[in-house]
Design a protein with these regions (language model features):
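Append "and, occasionally, other polyanion-binding protein interfaces
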Residues: 1-107
């Protein structure tokens, strides 16, 4: 697994997201941990481990169907603004499974 390739993929597929300026050891560990968790989920859902094509598909799905994650939007209740998500958030097991199951689509 190339952490640099994953980082480049995030930049390519989700240019509107709040990105990273530097790939630190902590972020490399985040990528490796996410990849292991996502592999298990992909095997369960797709019958095969996640590869870069599968990761790109996940990010493209977000770009097309989960626009709210990539936009700053006002919060009607608090009057504050929800900020678009950072790359870190897209690399969590919880978000990955929710996106794969369609629970995070725009409504």
């Amino acid at each position: 697994l190339s952490c640099d390739e994953v980082w480049q993929c995030l930049k390519d597929e989700l240019p509107e997201a709040r990105g990273w300026r530097c790939l630190t050891d902590e972020r490399r560990n985040l990528i490796r941990t996410f990849w292991g968790e996502a592999n298990k989920i992909a095997r369960n859902l797709d019958g095969k481990p996640m590869d870069m094509d599968g990761f790109r598909s996940y990010l493209r799905y977000i770009a097309q169907n989960c626009r709210w994650m990539l936009e700053d939007r006002p919060d009607q209740k608090s009057g504050k603004t929800w900020r678009r998500m950072k790359f870190d958030k897209f690399l969590t097991e919880k978000l990955y499974i929710e996106v794969r199951e369609g629970d995070r689509d725009d409504r």
